[in-house]
Amino acid sequence: LVGSEMCIRDRINGQGNFGSIDGDSAAAMRYTEIRLQKITAEILSDLDKQTVDFAPNYDNNEQEPIVLPSKVPVLLINGSSGIAVGMATNIPPHNLGEVIDASLALLDNENLSVQDLMEFVLAPDFPTGGIIYGLEEVKAGYLTGRGRVVMRGKVHTEILKHRGAEREAIIIDELPYQVNKAKLVEKIGILVREKSLEGIADLRDESDKSGIRVVIELKRHENAEVIINQLYKLTPLQDSFGMNMIALVDGYPKQL
């Protein structure tokens, strides 16, 4: 439940403490609840009109739909991850508008190739933002079912006033998907103390309800681009997501 709320907040609306990007634990189940957003009703639309087949549930007391009659491709939009005996799946989330555009194009021309559909859906769309670095392995993921998404945090530089003097700073605005912000800041601090990462005068987390803001103040005459590249190389500010597009098709697992 917590994982769903953190990933797909535009489809569901959680009430209560669902944890944080710093790794804080969520509240106990009895203190959290979720309601569907308006668009999520389209996943259940026309369920009462015999649009999908029903089968007995686990104890044969009720009938349940084999699949939901969704008007949108939920699996691609939400993404999915899980482990079973001898197999695993790891499907990244995608942009709602892009997937719907691709779906409409496929309805108009069912012979469209994966390459054609990638004109509408270039890459995954992760809820924490960030930048996707390179598309070749993403294309491989779409074409073969296996690939890798290299993600980078989004940064910019600012000139800050410090005791009457100006000092350049690197500001981290967005993080790669599933990266813990507190552990990232801790990792940067360790590298600075060990002198594996030099040129940093101060490090602080100014994040609040308005968004992420990690400030890395530089020493005088340091090159911000060089330090940014070191951050990508040495810390989780650059991370990857392994694509393994396995889903159940007609009741059997299939590499998509």
Report the location of each language-model feature.
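Feature marking long nucleic-acid-engaging regions of large polymerase/nuclease enzymes
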Residues: 69-108, 157-185, 189-256
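Hydrophobic/aromatic pocket-lining and membrane-interface residues
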Residues: 2-3, 231
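Generic preference for hydrophobic/aromatic residues in regular secondary structure cores
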Residues: 6, 54, 155-157, 200
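Catalytic phosphate-handling regions of large nucleic-acid enzymes and associated NTPases
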Residues: 3-148, 213-215
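Eukaryotic nuclear low-complexity, Arg/Ser/Gly/Pro-rich intrinsically disordered regions
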Residues: 144-160
